[in-house]
């Protein structure tokens, strides 16, 4: 914990020289509750941003469920806590280069909405497969499936934010990305609660993992149904 706190302080200090160039808004800029409603309404009014918002909801929800329940799920399957924790930390590491990779692919080679659609279907299949785990599955096979989860459900952030920023009109990048991310927070708060409810009702984890895959499938369908990428929005 102390090391994590020290790292936060180090990052804060390293960012200080950039404040003069990036933090140009006046500290007296008024913050109104109506700004939240305006931002959400503006995001929902544009089809591409609406799709991104739902994707952020589904992706962040899936991520939150995986992070919250994976280790407990493994121990319920009879795996030692140390082994479950070690596997978790290993597969989580895949997300670090994954976030950079997908943003790079979407920025230079493949349309961003197609990359997001591929990530959606990838996380739907892999998170659904987690419901099929049994105590007889070898850790190597479990690791292979969960690495796909990490490479999809935990690696979407870079391309999601870059696409939201690209679609935002000039001067509204912060508001638009914030609006999209707000739906992600709703997913992160609600999805683990739904998973917990299904766990209590069914007495097992399988139903929760399968249901968790459904929003991702819908996102994949939405993304692949889109046509050519639109240009930057001039107004919302």
Predicted regions mapped to residue ranges:
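Juxtamembrane intracellular "pre-TM" segments in multi-pass secondary transporters
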Residues: 18-53
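Extracytoplasmic gate region of multi-pass secondary transporters
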Residues: 47-100
């Amino acid at each position: 914990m102390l090391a994590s706190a020290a790292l936060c302080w180090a990052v804060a200090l390293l960012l200080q020289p950039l404040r003069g160039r990036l933090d140009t808004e006046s500290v007296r800029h008024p913050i109104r509750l109506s700004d939240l409603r305006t931002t959400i309404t503006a995001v929902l009014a544009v089809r591409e941003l609406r799709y991104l918002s739902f994707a952020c909801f589904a992706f962040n929800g899936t991520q939150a469920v995986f992070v919250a329940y994976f280790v407990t799920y493994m121990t319920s399957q009879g795996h030692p806590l140390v082994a479950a924790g070690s596997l978790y930390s290993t597969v989580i590491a895949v997300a670090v280069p994954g976030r950079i990779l997908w943003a790079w692919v979407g920025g230079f080679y493949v349309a961003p909405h197609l990359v997001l659609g591929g990530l959606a279907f990838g996380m739907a299949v892999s998170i659904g497969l987690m419901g099929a785990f049994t105590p007889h599955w070898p850790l190597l096979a479990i690791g292979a499936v969960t690495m796909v989860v990490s490479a999809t459900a935990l690696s979407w952030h870079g391309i999601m934010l870059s696409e939201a920023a690209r679609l935002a009109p000039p001067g509204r990048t912060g508001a638009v990305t914030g609006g999209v991310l707000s739906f992600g927070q709703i997913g992160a708060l609600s999805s683990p609660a739904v998973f917990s409810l299904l766990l209590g009702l069914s007495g097992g984890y399988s139903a929760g993992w399968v249901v968790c895959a459904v929003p991702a499938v819908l996102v994949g369908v939405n993304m692949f149904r889109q046509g050519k990428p639109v240009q930057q929005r001039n107004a919302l």
